[in-house]
UniProtKB/Swiss-Prot annotation:
It is an enzyme of class 6 (ligase). The gene is asnS. GO terms for cellular component: cytoplasm. Keywords: Aminoacyl-tRNA synthetase, ATP-binding, Cytoplasm, Ligase, Nucleotide-binding, Protein biosynthesis. One of its GO terms (biological process) is asparaginyl-tRNA aminoacylation. This is Asparagine--tRNA ligase. Its main location: cytoplasm. InterPro entries: Aa-tRNA-synt_II, aa-tRNA-synth_II, aa-tRNA-synth_II/BPL/LPL, Asn-tRNA-ligase, Asp/Asn-tRNA-synth_IIb, NA-bd_OB-fold, NA-bd_OB_tRNA. Belongs to the class-II aminoacyl-tRNA synthetase family. It comes from Symbiobacterium thermophilum (strain DSM 24528 / JCM 14929 / IAM 14863 / T).
Amino acid sequence: MKWVTVDRLPQYEGQTVELRGWVQNYRSSGKIQFIIFRDGTGVCQAVLFIKDVPPEVFEAGKRLTQESSIIIRGSVRKDDRAPGGYEIGVQDLEIVQIAEEYPITKKEHGTEFLMDHRHLWIRSNRQVAILRIRNEITMAIHQFLQENGFVLTESPILMGTAAEGGATLFETTYVNDEPAYLSQSGQLHVEATAMALGRVYTFGPTFRAEKSKTRRHLIEFWMVEPEAAYFTHEDNMRLQEEMVTYVVRRVLERRSKELQLIGRDTTLLEKVEPPFPRITYTEAVEMLKKLHKPGDEWEPIEWGEDFGAPHETVLTQQFEKPVFVEKFPVKVKAFYMQPDPENPDVVLGADLLAPEGYGEIIGGSQRIHDPELLKRRFEEHGLDMNTYGWYYDLRRFGSVPHSGFGLGIERTVAWICGLEHVRETIPFPRLLNRLHP
């Protein structure tokens, strides 16, 4: 008998198949037992009629508990009333394990309780849908970049220096007793591989010990960081809007059921297409001043100050599509960003803010390629030339203009799924006060 998965049941209508999975729910009405069955690919209803199965099979069904693991064999029939639209007429039931009393029941549970039981909570329909959408986003990014000539490369997770100035580091001790740090970004190393391969990207976890307890912050999160030789600031933004559009369209096309299950209104997602609106940092500062009203919980900023999450929220509410905010002051951005030749007080960099209040999902820039300018930036930021000597070498041996960006996977998932908090975007989130499970 063929072992099939729930998502493939429409292909086997009228046939007898085997399914392997778990009991999501169970009820009995005397001579009929109803099992809501899940296997990770979907949910279906399995029905045991006392007259259709041997007595020992019907008795086995009475023992089932929530999350018991089972193997069922039976005929596939279409039933629009059943979850998933298909039903299994059970002919045989094999119990793999009877689960103990399951802690997550139909009643409402608080967030902390669910996070304490995250290893079990991820089995719920909503969490499965979110994780499938996350997978679709990840695979779409890989496919887009590969099709556009980018080579996947790896940056180290153990670093001898910090990639981003100002962010808090996780420090450990290396084998020779020198300090080492968990990576905050793969960017500096991916700049080196871009000089070897032309167009590259790295995809991996990053770690920032920021004491931020907001709906947008994780201590450990995943980033994709493309870098391309000879790319300008304009090329960089064009790549970003093309990639984000590709990802959103792919999710809408392939994960519509999951989006519907989690209750996502896709009206604005369907409007995502190039070109994205662009405003300068200076225009954004002025916009915030005009939008501010007495009694607002946020205050406008002056030119030269960085945005906070409330400012990004307000800005994104003015646009239906993701919006670029570009040309930030030099002093609020990282040392490696290329100044604008038309105005050296600002950099050729941009943040891409997702609409509906989600804020920054991408930060990117053209990088400094002039060795003397980079040396001055080292001095201004108090960076040790010996420590960053290898990075400086990239400007000594065939330096070229180049650009790149970092996209945060969790924030992107939160936006596309319409989630209140990033904690649901990854199987086991690492939050300010949560290291377990």
